[in-house]
A protein has these predicted regions:
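Glycine-rich N-terminal segment of FAD-binding domains in flavoprotein oxidoreductases
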Residues: 29-57
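Ligand-binding beta-strand-loop-alpha-helix segment within the catalytic cores
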Residues: 2-4, 63-130
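Class I SAM-dependent methyltransferase SAM-binding "motif I" and its flanking Rossmann-like core
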Residues: 135-182
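Short, conserved loop/helix-junction motifs that constitute active-site signature segments
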Residues: 58-66, 152-154, 182-187, 221-225
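A glycine- and small-aliphatic-rich helix-loop capping segment at beta-alpha/alpha-beta transitions
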Residues: 54-62, 85-89, 144-153, 208-209
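N-terminal glycine-/serine-/threonine-rich phosphate-binding loop
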Residues: 1-40
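ATP/nucleoside-binding phosphotransfer catalytic cores, i.e., glycine-rich phosphate-binding loops
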Residues: 180-182, 186-235
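Glycine-rich beta-strand-to-loop/alpha-helix junction loops that act as flexible
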Residues: 42-47, 131-135, 195
Length: 235
């Protein structure tokens, strides 16, 4: 399990946004001070979007920051479901380097291999991996399904794989590419942002179960060697 897990609870969305923006800004600035560059993995979706938009306003040397999605849907980059498109729209105007992890490969497993090769060219490990979680316990795009074990136990040198969630999520019924649990586990810092009592209950159970968890998020957290801050917006 993660070396240490600390919960931060918020009653108001604005307070959570401010806290995450402040902490992520500090992480990025610390990486820039230490190494002259920063590599971060951000999630897509509706929950992180307002946080990312506010983060982009921070006085950070964005030209020295490389951003990758923690996961993405296998759709064209101009599709509304594309995580990298959302991230790029927010951060490219600030000068950040935003790299897609998807490709034109028709087969999701080939797309995963292409993503893994692309990530091999980056200065690793990431300075930050920012995770979310669904009500099925998935994190990044490590979903319950036939590819879950590959994403969770695919080898220390495998940074990304293709996955076919089963069942496909109704809000985005497409295959995906995701960072693996081992890649997430190498991060210098890690945070997880959720909202609502239902997700909190699931996450607490997943953490308690650890490496034996039926929830992907529990097993991912088990592989993270650094402390993890969890930001939770209460109902």
């Amino acid at each position: 399990m993660a070396e240490e897990i600390e919960w931060w609870d918020f009653d108001a969305a604005e307070d959570l946004i401010d806290a995450v923006v402040g902490d992520v800004s500090f992480i990025i600035e610390s990486a820039l001070d230490a190494r002259g560059q920063a590599l971060v993995a951000f999630p897509g979706g509706s929950t992180p979007k307002p946080i990312l938009e506010k983060l982009a306003q921070a006085n950070i040397r964005w030209k020295s920051v490389t951003i990758i999605p923690t996961d993405d849907r296998l759709v064209p980059v101009d599709n509304a479901l594309s995580n990298v498109a959302m991230i790029a729209k927010i951060f490219i105007p600030k000068g950040a380097r935003v790299l897609p992890i998807t490709s034109d490969a028709a087969d999701y497993k080939l797309a995963g291999g292409a993503a893994n090769a692309r990530l091999a060219d980056l200065h690793w490990p990431p300075d930050l991996v920012w995770l979310g979680m669904g009500t099925d316990g998935h994190t990044a795009s490590i979903f319950p399904g036939p590819d879950m074990e590959t994403a969770l136990e695919g080898g220390k040198d495998v940074r990304a794989v293709g996955v076919a969630p089963d069942p496909l999520p109704p809000e985005a019924p497409v295959n995906r590419v995701t960072l693996t649990a081992s890649a997430i586990g190498t991060a210098r810092t890690a945070i997880l942002v959720i909202n609502g009592a239902e997700k909190r209950e699931i996450l607490e159970a997943a953490i308690e179960q650890g490496s034996k968890s039926a929830y992907p998020v529990g097993r991912v957290l088990d592989k993270i060697a650094v402390p993890v801050d969890i930001y939770c917006l209460d109902d």
